[in-house]
Amino acid sequence: MTSVSRFPEPQAVTSPLTEYAVFLVVTIAPGHEAAQTARDVVGEVGDLVRAVGFRSLHGGLTCVVGIGSEAWDRFDAPARPEHLHPFVAIDGFAHDAPSTPGDLLFHIRASRHDLCFELERLILDALGDAVSVVDDTPGFRYFDARDLLGFVDGTENPVGDGLTDAAYVDGDGDFAGGSYVVTQRYTHDLAAWGRLSTEEQERIIGRTKADDVELADEVMPSNSHVVLNTLTDDEGNDLDIVRFNMAFGSYAAGEVGTYFIGYAKDPAITEEMLRNMFVGKPAGNYDRILDFSTATSGCLFFVPSSATLAMLDDLPPLAEATPTPPAEATPPTPDSSLRVGSLRGEYER
């Protein structure tokens, strides 16, 4: 098992689920001055968290900072995380997973919404016109950590050492203790979902609705959400991610949904789960939850350890002549096999 003590101090990736969150995604404006401002602020977010958190010592305020592929290059860091690349859009069997812009992620969590709001305000004030906000979604914990479809979400998150093993990079030199995070915003058609019987809903999810018990193997559909999100390696070991999804909604905007945020030591694990959902395993045997939940965004970020994040603040100033790089070519499609073994009998959601 991996121990956190082997790493530089991680960011607060594995902090417990809170009552409130803000998912803030921004893009950085062209030019070295904007990149310099963004890099400076990213390195100083910890100071802002302490300043706001001191006002409520029991508020549980944290902020995880993620850096996108193009932004990492613009920051002129001396090295690059091994698996960092833009989120690859998925052309699914019946539904698609889009790739959308995002240079920086600020995943803010607290037990009070005012703490989240105040930290977000200070971050955006510091960034100024160096960035544009492309996603600003306030999330909330819905009853006993259920999604708006009525099912408990994140039941099978690993615990203990397994949580550390799943969330943090072990190796990769200076990037040990970091994490890769994928974010997606899903909107739900609750009216259509509500027309299904509870039994139909349970077969789509793979768990009972009232008491959150996994369906027995003999009645578990092969395209249930649980089955398609269960991966093992060639030795039969579980390949897990850590989810901190939250509900969101605005009836004025006419949308309700789930903000998916999944942390992993290797983004290929999350990407394999998403391909299973959208393409199906085998192809065409896709996740029927997508008939009621539409992905409207998709980003991938690297979450450096706290030490690496602080290191960015100590780098030499960006040279004025440094051009804004052209858009990256789409990276090669990750190996769809991931060396993943057969789906096991015990599934997870």
Model-predicted segments: where are they?
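Long, histidine/aromatic-enriched segments associated with O2/redox biology
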Residues: M1-Y347
